[in-house]
Amino acid sequence: MEDFVRQCFNPMIVELAEKAMKEYGEDPKIETNKFAAICTHLEVCFMYSDFHFIDERSESIIVESGDPNALLKHRFEIIEGRDRTMAWTVVNSICNTTGVEKPKFLPDLYDYKENRFIEIGVTRREVHTYYLEKANKIKSEETHIHIFSFTGEEMATKADYTLDEESRARIKTRLFTIRQEMASRGLWDSFVNPREAKRQLKKNLKSLEPCADLQTKVSHRTSPALKTLEPMWMDSNRTAALRASFLKCQKK
C-alpha cells in the first residue's frame, strides 16, 4: 500500500500526509491504510477548492485558466493540511473577521461565499452512516458537512452540495479511479475490511521489527509545501500546485 500511495498521489500531498501522521506519532510505513486515507482526504480537499474564486464584486466564479494577475480571491480557505497551531490560527482569524461561530473541532475548509466552515468526509462505507457520525461528533449547525464515497455517492447538509455538478463529478471520478487502482493491485479489500487491515498491520509491524531503533523524533519545521496553503490572491504557482494535486495514478 505504501508504494501505491507514493505512486498514486502528488508528492506534495504525500509530504503533508506524512507530516500529519508524524505529528500524532503514527508511522506511514506501518499504518499504510491510514496513510492512503489521509492522502485521499487531502486530495479531495484540494480538488474541492480548485478553480473556484470570488471576483471583485464578491461573485463566485470558476476559472480554469486565465490572467494570473486578475483580482480573484480563492473562494475556499484550505485548513486541512496545516499543522494544528497554524490551522487554529487561521480559524480564529476567519472567525474574528467574519463573525462566524468558532467550531469545536478543526474543519477542513472555509467557504467565503457562503460564510461557513466545511467538513469534508471520504468514506469506504455507506455515506449516510458516515454523515451521521460526523454530525454527532461536530454537533454544530454552523459547520457544513459534505461526504463523498468511493462508489460515487455523496451526502451534504440540507442537500446543499456547494459545488457545481461538474466539480463534484471530478472528485467522484478521482475517487473511483483510486478504488480501481487499489483493486487492480489487490489492495482494496484490506482497505475496506477492518479485519483484513488489522492482519496487514500486524504483518507490517513484524516486517519492521529489526528497525525498531530508528529515529522517531518529529520535525517541527514548516514544510515548504504548506506555503501553497497560505491565504492569497490567485497566482500561477498556487494554481499549478492545485492542478498537480489530482494527477492520475501512475501505472507501474
Swiss-Prot record:
<feature type="site" description="Important for efficient shutoff activity">
    <location>
        <position position="203"/>
    </location>
</feature>
<feature type="site" description="Important for efficient shutoff activity and nuclear localization">
    <location>
        <position position="199"/>
    </location>
</feature>
<feature type="active site">
    <location>
        <position position="108"/>
    </location>
</feature>
<feature type="active site">
    <location>
        <position position="80"/>
    </location>
</feature>
<comment type="subunit">
    <text>Interacts with host RACK1.</text>
</comment>
<feature type="site" description="Important for efficient shutoff activity">
    <location>
        <position position="202"/>
    </location>
</feature>
<keyword id="KW-1132">Decay of host mRNAs by virus</keyword>
<keyword id="KW-1262">Eukaryotic host gene expression shutoff by virus</keyword>
<feature type="site" description="Important for efficient shutoff activity and nuclear localization">
    <location>
        <position position="198"/>
    </location>
</feature>
<keyword id="KW-1192">Host mRNA suppression by virus</keyword>
<comment type="function">
    <text>Plays a major role in the shutoff of the host protein expression by cleaving mRNAs probably via an endonuclease activity. This host shutoff allows the virus to escape from the host antiviral response. Hijacks host RNA splicing machinery to selectively target host RNAs containing introns for destruction. This may explain the preferential degradation of RNAs that have undergone co- or post-transcriptional processing.</text>
</comment>
<keyword id="KW-1190">Host gene expression shutoff by virus</keyword>
<feature type="site" description="Important for efficient shutoff activity">
    <location>
        <position position="206"/>
    </location>
</feature>
<protein>
    <recommendedName>
        <fullName>Protein PA-X</fullName>
    </recommendedName>
</protein>
<keyword id="KW-0945">Host-virus interaction</keyword>
<comment type="similarity">
    <text>Belongs to the influenza viruses PA-X family.</text>
</comment>
<keyword id="KW-1048">Host nucleus</keyword>
<feature type="site" description="Important for efficient shutoff activity and nuclear localization">
    <location>
        <position position="195"/>
    </location>
</feature>
<keyword id="KW-1035">Host cytoplasm</keyword>
